[in-house]
């Protein structure tokens, strides 16, 4: 108990220091003043005359209040743990010790997450994300791999508390998917998932090979911010768009749509293309596809570099040998390794079940070091 109590005190001191740094960074008096100003603004009689501006103000107000509330929770957790330590110095109590250890462990994780979010300072990092997976080299195995990645990113999103909506899906010839697009709604979804763009390589014994041979497959991942008014305000001349329609649905049977509701839009100057199939009408799919296309163009404009498109779009790089960002080896051994950060794990099952935090965090810290 003495050793455990000593460790608990040490953790308490470390977290106290981190909380002090966090308090300075947040500028609590400034946040409180900001809340008062925004509340006064929201109370004005003409507040709703400009609906868009009013919604932006309310969003900022809610986010600022959330920061203050989060700080209050952290402070209370630390104070509760401090009180338990004082009690433990007077009397041994294993249950209280366990409670304090659990509270501090959770507090450390929350501070880690908050500190990581401070690395997400890009103009669209706080937005939701549009994530597209395209099967690459590897035939049916690659299409199956694309479907496996769909599940992996869906599970990761659900664990973060994000909402996932299927925007487009194109089924494989025999199994799996040729392509799929997800809309992931939640704060910082784009900031986290932008680390996933690129080519993902799978090595395994192919379930589609009668001889049980080892197969290498590839899939490309593209990530864009999920934008609202920012994308709508971007004007694209009609002459720059090639819009085509087709039937949506699977390989056959009742799921095939007999009406041409699927929409594909190509931005002719850049070659950027978007396909949307999941809405009920052609008009809805067209609006959805155009919104995604505008988001892609905004990111390209934001980059303002000669090779902006190639760098910002994961599917612009051929999903094949030599282009991968991460290897997933299922056979002859089990290992997932990120080639950019060298972070690796043998817990292949956990990764495929959405345990991506170690890879994402390492990449964000790696990128921050490069930028600095």
UniProtKB/Swiss-Prot annotation:
Cellular localization per UniProt: Cytoplasm
Gene Ontology biological process: viral translational frameshifting
GO molecular function, one term: translation release factor activity, codon specific
N5-methylglutamine found at: 254
Entry keyword Cytoplasm: yes
Superkingdom to which the source organism belongs: Bacteria
A Pfam family the protein falls into: RF-1
Post-translational modification summary for this protein: Methylated by PrmC. Methylation increases the termination efficiency of RF2.
PANTHER family for this protein: CLASS I PEPTIDE CHAIN RELEASE FACTOR, PEPTIDE CHAIN RELEASE FACTOR 2
Family of the protein in this entry: Belongs to the prokaryotic/mitochondrial release factor family.
NCBIfam families: prfB
Described function: Peptide chain release factor 2 directs the termination of translation in response to the peptide chain termination codons UGA and UAA.
Protein's name in the database: Peptide chain release factor 2
